[in-house]
Amino acid sequence: MAARCWVWGFVVALLAVAAAADGEEEEGKWEPLIRMPTEEGDDAEAAAPAPAPAAADYGGTRWAVLVAGSSGYGNYRHQADVCHAYQILQKGGVKEENIVVFMYDDIAHNILNPRPGTIINHPKGGDVYAGVPKDYTGHQVTTENFFAVLLGNKTAVTGGSGKVIDSKPEDHIFIYYSDHGGPGVLGMPNLPYLYAGDFIKVLQKKHASNSYSKMVIYVEACESGSIFEGLMPENLNIYVTTASNAVENSWGTYCPGEEPSPPPEYITCLGDMYSVAWMEDSETHNLKKETIEDQYELVKKRTSNANKLNEGSHVMEYGDKTFKDEKLFLYQGFNPANGNITNELIWPVPKATVNQRDADLLFMWKRYEQLNGVSEDKLRALREIEDTIAHRKHLDSSIDFIGKLVFGFENGPLALEAARSSGQPLVDNWDCLKKMVRIFESQCGSLTQYGMKYMRAFANICNNGVSEAKMMEASINACGRYNSARWSPMTEGGHSA
């Protein structure tokens, strides 16, 4: 009983910030200029101009890779982000054959979806799911397939449509990723995770193949700056922006209890702060006039949440910054319907946001509240909350104890949390990092998306020269009595590395 009371108190505290936003009026309004084929409106006949050709104005072809790196209805927002991005590119004239979409595709037809067969990315937005190609779904959404697609390697792709980025030297590439992350890693619904060291090598290989002119990458994830900090060369003709710096969270938005709140039948967040910022900017601006730098500055301002960085994050930029003056249409296309707009965005300012890592708990709690009476489903929902929080506490305590065993009881916590100075990569040896993660998970259970935040701890263990044998001994001592069957890497789909 005491444990259950603690769980309730934890979740209630988690929801307090979002709940405080209820009842407040937002200023401004959201006026999407994109219309889905199924949407009707007074100006439907006026929105008829045909999309611009993908190769117009500069001689090359536009390519795009869109990745939603999660699964499960509690992560609704990531697939909503990616579907929305697809609609923007498609309206901009980027051909479907040149857009590769990775998404698990378990949201639109999920039993919990109050509007079956549709996905929305804004409380007042229309369906963004219609027409999105199913290139790589379910078990095909993997790091290996993503790398193969980016490199244009058709023989290395497993399953899916087989579509790859078959780009030429004069072409432009846009990559957008949305999911959970941690220091040096990005999530994938099928393990292992995407590790920064591997990603940078793939980008270098793509550049060496002379198969593109310029590339722009947008990444939505916690600690997403750590994927590129100290690693991203400036001579690859690749410009990157990330939702957060190397040491902070990114944030979900349009969540239950926020303003603007999703329709009452939705029990999960509809979008992510950085992602909706760039997309709502793109669809309300003339991308033949707006530059890459213009969008970066606008998104940075909005994502900081009016500089309330306890509920916002620092948008960062990496790589080659010499072509920021290029117009966005080179990467995202140009929607002729936006040709005469004034480049002024009126957006509703969220009164609160939800930490990416806690958004799943918000969903679980809203699901519990939605169920009536004392049904078996409601009890099962409560047990899921209890199990999830208990495993989080286990991860917290076991990592802390391992640090004390390895570095001493006095120095352990500080040694694990130490962040390197700006400009340095997270870890010197990425293979070591992966080995330490596997050792930990073999004894202590899966890290899960919550435990991704401890990648810096494993990196510091490597950077301090701790041996695999010592890490194994510490992990056994920390977790020897823990029944990890529920959270075994085998149960969770494999190791994170």
Swiss-Prot record:
**Domain of life of the source:** Eukaryota
Q: Name the gene for this chain.
A: VPE1
Which effects follow disruption of this gene? In PAK22, higher quantities of 57 kDa polypeptides and lower levels of 40 kDa acidic and 20 kDa basic glutelin subunits in seeds due to reduced vacuolar processing enzyme (VPE) activity and leading to non-crystalline lattice structure of protein storage vacuoles (PSVs). Seedlings growth retardation.
Any S-S bridges, and between which cysteines?
Answer: 255-269, 432-462, 444-479
Q: What is this protein called?
A: Vacuolar-processing enzyme beta-isozyme 1
Q: Which organism is it from?
A: Oryza sativa subsp. japonica
- In the UniProt record, which residues carry a glycan? 153, 340
Which family does the entry's similarity section mention? Belongs to the peptidase C13 family.
Chain segments annotated as transmembrane: none
Q: What class of enzyme is it?
A: hydrolase
Active-site positions, per UniProt?
180, 222
Effect after changing residue 333 to D = In EM856; reduced vacuolar processing enzyme (VPE) activity leading to non-crystalline lattice structure of protein storage vacuoles (PSVs)
GO cellular component term of the entry, any: protein storage vacuole
Which GO terms of the molecular function aspect are on file?
Answer: cysteine-type endopeptidase activity; nutrient reservoir activity
Signal peptide boundaries = 1-23
Tissue-level expression reads: Expressed in developing seeds.
- UniProt EC number: 3.4.22.34
Site entry (Required for post-translational maturation and enzyme activity), positions: 269
This chain's function reads: Asparagine-specific endopeptidase that may be involved in processing of proteins targeted to vacuoles. Cysteine protease required for post-translational proteolysis of seed storage proteins in the protein storage vacuole (PSV) of developing seeds, by processing of proglutelin precursor to mature glutelin subunits, thus contributing to the formation of protein crystalline structures in PSV.
Question: What Pfam families does the database record attribute to this sequence?
Answer: Legum_prodom, Peptidase_C13
InterPro entries reported in the protein's UniProt record: AE, Legum_prodom, Legumain_prodom_sf, Peptidase_C13
As recorded in UniProt, coiled-coil segments are: none
PTM summary from the entry reads: Auto-catalytic activation.
Q: Which GO terms describe its biological process?
A: protein storage vacuole organization; proteolysis involved in protein catabolic process; vacuolar protein processing
Q: Which UniProt keywords apply?
A: Disulfide bond, Glycoprotein, Hydrolase, Protease, Seed storage protein, Signal, Storage protein, Thiol protease, Vacuole
